[in-house]
Structures are given as C-alpha cells and as structure tokens.
C-alpha cells in the first residue's frame, strides 16, 4: 500500500515485564529518543513499558534496537502504522505506578492472564455464539468503531472496568469471554482481572485492533468503523491511514465534519460534546490558545512542542531588538 512509502512511522508498543530498575531506565531512554528525533510518550513502571512514538524508519529502528538490547524487552510487542506528518510534538518518558491504570495493585499480567488469539483466528472466536465479546476501551473510542456484536461497557476510563465486571459478568454464567482494545495492553490486563475473579476461558486479541487491521483483509474483516488512536491522527481506517475524524481541543472527543457544522462547535473552544460543560474562564483560555496557534501557523510554527520554543525565542529576540533600537534612538 502507498502508506508504507510515507516518511513517518508511528510505533505503538508495550510489554508486561518486571522492571525493578524502571526509574534508572528513564533518562537513558529519553536521551535515545531525543538523539534519534523520536517523539511521543513512553511510560515506565515496575510492571513494564507502554507507549506510542513516531519518527523516520531509521530512528524507530534505532529505538527498537536500543530497547531490545535489554534481554527483558527483546520480544517487546509493537505495531506500526504510517502518517505523512509527525503526530507528536515532544519526546517524553514518564514514570508511573502502572503502565495502564486499572487501579488494583494485586492484578499482575506477568503472573496470570488470558489466552492470546492471533488476528487470523479472531473471527472464528467471536463468531461463536458462546463467546461474550467485550470492548475494553472508553466510550468515546467505541463510538467511532468496534467489532460486530461487541459489548460496550460504557466506561469513561479504564479504572471503571472492574466495576463493570463486578456488576455485569459472572464466571458461572459467562464461560467464554473475549476482549480487545487498541494495541492489546488494556485487554491483556483485563484478562488478568477476570482470571483473578475466577473466569476460566478468557481470551484477548494479540496485538489489538491495530494488528487485526494490519493482518486481516478488509473483505474478511468483522471490524466496523474506524479505530481511535491517541495522537493527532485521532483515528485510522482499515488501511491504517488517517481516518475521517478530528478532535475537539476542549474535551478531546472525536468529531466529524458534520459535527463542525453544529452551532455548538467553535474551533479550539467547544463542540456538541462539551459546550455546556466548559466554563467561561476555560473558553477564554481556549480562545487565547487558538489565537496563538493561528499566529504561530502564520509564521510557519506549531504552537506546541519544540517549534513553540523556537517561536518563543524568535519573539523574545524581536522584543530585545526593539528595546535596543528604542534605547539607541533615545541616546541620539
């Protein structure tokens, strides 16, 4: 496909593995990202590593080689897609208690989790009438795409998933449960939760939705809609190309071109999801940010990340030059 000729490689990765020295790993990893001009965010915790980054083919290969040099990460799970533009603005490595937040300390996928199902075998599993298929992602992600017949838990964040399980699932009644998420990390931790609660047959999609879209032909696919991603692309289609959604700056919800025509939508300030939830103070702040973004765009800069720093430095230099010119004029 043509997208493979694009310049930017977007790489989503994770691995549940005990990293007792995760704090010491942070700076060398960040230095490697910066050296190779890899942008995005990686999370480190005692339970493993997780994140999405982007860069040129060479820079991503260099980062993966660096990670795989650690025997604990030699088989790190990663999925790649492609984009014409850099979808991230900064290079960040954060230290966390969990690499994906469930909020239950005793749940450890390194000790127990469900059975991996390869993308090529996923259709057979979820077509089984005995299988309970659950989308472990958030409400706003599910709204724009999911698998046929998947259950929506209606959660706003992953921390709410344990409550959904307690209130809606029963190991005696639901004998066969299959779960999925964007890249595989949330559903892997979800299977650990269900196994801990006594569920027997628990399955999860290896590599998540992104791997399924990559490996399963569109004509055989049971995926419906687009897949939400946590970067400036907002969503990708079945070809892993940027989809038809943008994102509201105020609430981060995905929005369509039709949504932008609604009266509640004001670029950079509000949309129909949040117009009645955003305070006037917030709207004023968002309006100022949008103004600065427009000014930055006119100068050929982005308003965030490294380019914002360049713009700030440029403005500072201009002010200093103006002050110096005024001082010299006053001395004449």
Swiss-Prot record:
Any Pfam family hit:
UPF0176_N
* Matches recorded under PROSITE patterns: RHODANESE_3
Residue ranges occupied by any Rhodanese domain in the UniProt entry: 127-221
Give the first-level EC class, as a single word: oxidoreductase
The record ties this protein, via InterPro entries, to:
Rhodanese-like_dom (IPR001763), Rhodanese-like_dom_sf (IPR036873), TrhO (IPR020936), TRHO_N (IPR040503)
Where do the catalytic residues lie? 181 (cysteine persulfide intermediate)
Q: Where is the composition biased (Basic and acidic residues)?
A: 321-332
Biological process (GO) annotations? tRNA modification
Q: Keywords in UniProt for this one? A: Oxidoreductase, tRNA processing
Q: Does the keyword Iron apply?
A: no
Similarity-based family: Belongs to the TrhO family.
Q: Which HAMAP family match?
A: TrhO
Provide the function of this protein. Catalyzes oxygen-dependent 5-hydroxyuridine (ho5U) modification at position 34 in tRNAs.
What name does UniProt use for this protein?
tRNA uridine(34) hydroxylase
